Regions:
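Catalytic or ion-coupling anion/metal-binding cores of large enzyme and transporter domains
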Residues: 1-257, 262-344
Length: 344
């Protein structure tokens, strides 16, 4: 593989085939479709947005909802199904799974070889249709990562329906708010914590600036006393990320994050939160006037304690929000083909 990779790189240079020829808008849309078809990670959202930003490719959070909404989930893998990654490999692999939805991809998008991506989806046998399902009977008909918005997430938030509990995708419940990971760990299992199965767990201070670095803690654990009652999922909201192997009705990447002054910073325990997947809405029952009062009050209190020196300061001063890829703002935009000065 190393030899073949080196050979291909030389061939690309000789042919003048550049990354910008390969990573076009349609290629990014194909990536979104592929993620939906295999139940891929929510992390793909920030990764693809950041890469597109560095190439100067027009890609927005809304594209994930639009491109992935009608894509069926073709693989019966955990956390959305039964099997494991090794089972997918033995059943034919990712390309066999994507071949089931090959008609959905943009045909003009090419790969590093210069050939259209869809050519690699032809003649891909499936060896186990319990793992890679037929097109007519997918695990889920609409598996794409959903983009939510509302007064709790003006610039958007995301949820992975394929990993969620269907009954919780339309939900109204009171917030139980944690200001940080440390606050959550200190209070979550307190027997006196006022929380029920209908509560919505809210974790803030875990976004790109707030942590800093946007850790994978969005799929926060459930309170012990509810686990002992047999509860296995609850609606959870945060400005953090979560692992692609995690399960649950978890709303992530809330933008703007709390540390950037987003409405998530002003949610209080007891506020009623409404999740409406069908309507792509995430809101809390607080008037604009009350929200303004809370924001004004917060400004009069101690400000978010941002780092004051070193890489951490550079990072928080320049990191963008999750809805635009959480990249550093000075790295956005194509670099062009200028050859830099030799350093030797």
């Amino acid at each position: 593989m190393s030899h073949e990779t080196g050979r291909l790189i030389v061939e690309m240079v000789r042919a003048g085939r550049r990354p910008s020829d390969i990573m076009t808008r349609n290629s990014f849309l194909n990536a979104i479709i592929a993620v939906a078809a295999v139940g891929g990670s929510t992390n793909s959202v920030v990764h693809l947005l950041a890469i597109a930003g560095r190439l100067g490719v027009d890609l927005a959070l809304a594209d994930f909802d639009q491109a992935g909404r009608d894509v069926p989930l073709m693989v019966n893998l955990q956390p959305s199904g039964e099997f494991l990654m090794d089972d997918l490999y033995r059943a034919g692999g990712v390309l066999a799974a994507l071949s089931q939805v090959k008609d959905l991809f943009h045909r003009e998008a090419i790969t590093v070889t210069g050939r259209p991506f869809v050519e690699y989806l032809l003649d891909r046998p499936v060896y186990d249709d319990a793992v890679i399902l037929p097109r007519e009977s997918p695990v889920m008909a609409n598996a794409g990562i959903a983009v939510l918005s509302g007064n709790l997430a003006p610039n958007g938030a995301i949820i992975k329906p394929a990993a969620a509990t269907t009954a919780l995708l339309q939900h109204v419940g009171p917030a139980v708010v944690f200001d940080s990971i440390e606050d959550m760990r200190a209070r979550l299992d307190d027997p006196d914590l006022v929380v029920t199965v209908n509560s919505v767990l809210v974790l803030r201070g875990c976004g790109p600036r707030g942590y800093p670095g946007m850790p994978e803690v969005g799929n926060m654990p459930l309170p012990r006393k509810l686990l002992e009652q047999g509860v296995r999922d609850m609606v959870r909201i945060s400005d953090a990320r979560m692992s692609g192997t995690a399960y649950g009705t978890v709303i992530l990447h809330v933008a703007p994050e709390a540390a950037a002054g987003g409405p998530l910073a002003f949610v209080r325990t007891g506020d009623i939160i409404c999740l409406d997947l069908k309507g792509r809405s995430l809101s809390f029952d607080v008037s604009d006037e009350e929200l303004q009062r809370r924001e004004t009050s917060a400004k009069s209190q101690a400000a978010y304690a941002a780092p004051t020196r070193g890489w951490a300061k550079l990072y928080v001063d320049h990191v963008m929000q999750a809805d635009t890829g959480a990249d550093l703002d000075f790295l956005v935009g194509a670099s062009g083909d200028e050859v830099m000065r030799e350093s030797h």
